[in-house]
Amino acid sequence: MKTSIEAVSFRDMEQDCEFRFQKDYPFWHLYTDGHKADIIFSDNEDFKSGMNLLGVCCLRSPEVKVYTFVLMNNHLHMILSGASSKVIGLFDMFRLMLQRHFARSGRVVNLKDFKCQLIRIDSLQSLRNEIVYVNRNGFIVRPDCTPFSYPWGAGASFFNPCSKLRPSVTYDSL
C-alpha cells in the first residue's frame, strides 16, 4: 500500500481528482456582474463584514461546498458544488444579510443589480481553470496585491507556500 504522496504516480493522483470531481458534481462558478453593480464594499470594515457574513452563510448551507471565492468592491466570484437551488439559496442569504447589515449601520447601498449568475463547470480541467480565474481577480484589479496578499478571498490559501505547513481542516472540525 502506498503511504506517501511521493509513492503515488501522477496518473493515480489524476484518477483520484477525477473521482472526487464526479463525487461532488455539479460544480458552479457563481458571480455577480461588476459592470452593473454599485460599490458595495467601500472600505476595510465593509470587506470584513462581507467576509464574516459570507462565512456565516456558508456554515448555514452545509449542502453546498465552497472551494474558493473572492470579494471585490462591487461584485464577487465563488466556486461551489451542490444543487443549483442550494447554491442560489446561499447567495440569496448573503445578499439579504448584506442588506440588513448596511441598513443597521445606516449606510445606503444599492443592491438592486447585485444578482448572481451561475456557470456550470463540466470538467476537472474547467474546474481548475475557474479556480485560477477566481483567485487571480483580486490582484489583477489591485496591482498592489499578489496572490499571497489579497485579503478578501481564499487565494492566499491556494498560493501561499506556508499553507502547506498547516494541517488540512474543514470548518466543521474547528
Q: Where are the regions that the model predicts?
A:
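Short Pro-Cys-Gly-centered "Cys-loop" motif that presents a nucleophilic cysteine in a tight turn
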Residues: 1-73, 81-174
